[in-house]
C-alpha cells in the first residue's frame, strides 16, 4: 500500500510536450496518471492558465482537481470553488500608464476564453493564438467589478518603461506581449492541502518554467523536468527526463509512487 500523496502537475512543458501550438500528452504520461490514480493518490493540475482555458485539459486528461489562474483559482471534484481577481486599482493604474506611453493592452474581466481590447492594435501587434481577442471600443477597466488578467503588447526589455508593473505579478511566455496574472502556485497548493487536511510534506510538485518557481520553495517534494529552466533545476529535489522523453513516468517510478 503506497502512502497517499498529493500530486500537482503543471501543464505546458510538464504534462504536455511539443510547445503551445503542437502540444500533446505523451502516452507514458497518460499511463503514469492511470497508475497514480489506481495507487490512490490525489491528482491535481496546477496551471497559470485561466480556468476557462484549462478546463478542457482537465477533462481530456481525466483530472477532477485543478489549481488555475496562477494559484488563485481552485477546482475540487469538478467544481470551481472560486477565483481571486487581481487588485483592480493597480490594474487601472497600469492601463492608464500604458495609454500614456502608447502600449496596447487587453483585460480579462471574467472567467472566459476571450480577452477584451479597446481597439485592434493589440491583435495586430501580437498575432496571438493563445486566446480570442474581442475589440470593445471605449473599453474602460473601471467599468468592471473584477479583473482576472491583463495583457500588455511589448517586446522583451520594453516592459522596463512601465513603472506600474512593479506593483503587479507578470510573466512573459511570448515575444510580443506579457501576461499580468497571479504567479503564486504555492498559494493555491497550500489552499488545496488545507481543504484536504493534508500536510505540506505529502505534496509532490512537477514543473518546468518561470511560473513554477513559486512552488519550488516549500517543504514538499519538487520535481523539475529535464527541459526545465536552470533556476528551477537548482531548487529541485529530483530532475527527471524531458517531457517528451517519458519524464513524468520516470519520475513517478523513481519516487516509488506506483
Residues covered by each model-derived region:
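Asp-based phosphoryl-transfer active-site loop
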Residues: 3-21, 45, 216
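Asp-based, Mg2+/Mn2+-dependent phosphohydrolase catalytic module
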Residues: 218, 222-223, 228-258
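Conserved acidic, metal-coordinating active-site core of Asp-based
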Residues: 97, 101-104, 108-218, 227
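Short, structured coil segments at secondary-structure junctions
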Residues: 61-62, 70, 164-167, 218-219, ...
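Short, well-ordered alpha-helical microsegments
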Residues: 51-55, 158-159, 212-213, 232
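Hydrophobic "anchor" residues on beta-strands that sit immediately upstream
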Residues: 6, 65, 198, 204, ...
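Active-site phosphate-binding/coordination module
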Residues: 24-122
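Short hydrophobic/aromatic-enriched beta-strand-loop microsegments
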Residues: 63-71, 127, 171-172, 222-226, ...
Amino acid at each position: 500500500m503506497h502512502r497517499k500523496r498529493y500530486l500537482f502537475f503543471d501543464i505546458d512543458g510538464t504534462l504536455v510536450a511539443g510547445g503551445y501550438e503542437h502540444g500533446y500528452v505523451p502516452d507514458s504520461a497518460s499511463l503514469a496518471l492511470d497508475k497514480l490514480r489506481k495507487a490512490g493518490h490525489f491528482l491535481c493540475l496546477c496551471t497559470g492558465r485561466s480556468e476557462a482555458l484549462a478546463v478542457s485539459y482537465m477533462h481530456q486528461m481525466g483530472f477532477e482537481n485543478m489549481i488555475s489562474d496562477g494559484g488563485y483559482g481552485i477546482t475540487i471534484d469538478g467544481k470551481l470553488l472560486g477565483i481571486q481577481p487581481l487588485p483592480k486599482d493597480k490594474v487601472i493604474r497600469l492601463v492608464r500608464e500604458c495609454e500614456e506611453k502608447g502600449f496596447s493592452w487587453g483585460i480579462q474581466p471574467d472567467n472566459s476564453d476571450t480577452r477584451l481590447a479597446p481597439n485592434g492594435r493589440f491583435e495586430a501587434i501580437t498575432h496571438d493564438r493563445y486566446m480570442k481577442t474581442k475589440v470593445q471600443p471605449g473599453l474602460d477597466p473601471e467599468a468592471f467589478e473584477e479583473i482576472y488578467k491583463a495583457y500588455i503588447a511589448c517586446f522583451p526589455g520594453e516592459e522596463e518603461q512601465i513603472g506600474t508593473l512593479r506593483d503587479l505579478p507578470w510573466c512573459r511566455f511570448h515575444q510580443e506581449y506579457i501576461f499580468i496574472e497571479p504567479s503564486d502556485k504555492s498559494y493555491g497548493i497550500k489552499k488545496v492541502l488545507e481543504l484536504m487536511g493534508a500536510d505540506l510534506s505529502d505534496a509532490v510538485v512537477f514543473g518546468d518554467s518561470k511560473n513554477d518557481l513559486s512552488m519550488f520553495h516549500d517543504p514538499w517534494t519538487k520535481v523539475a523536468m529535464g527541459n526545465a529552466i536552470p533556476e528551477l533545476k537548482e531548487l529541485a529535489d529530483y530532475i527527471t527526463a524531458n517531457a517528451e522523453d517519458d519524464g513524468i513516468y520516470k519520475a513517478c517510478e523513481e519516487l516509488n509512487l506506483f
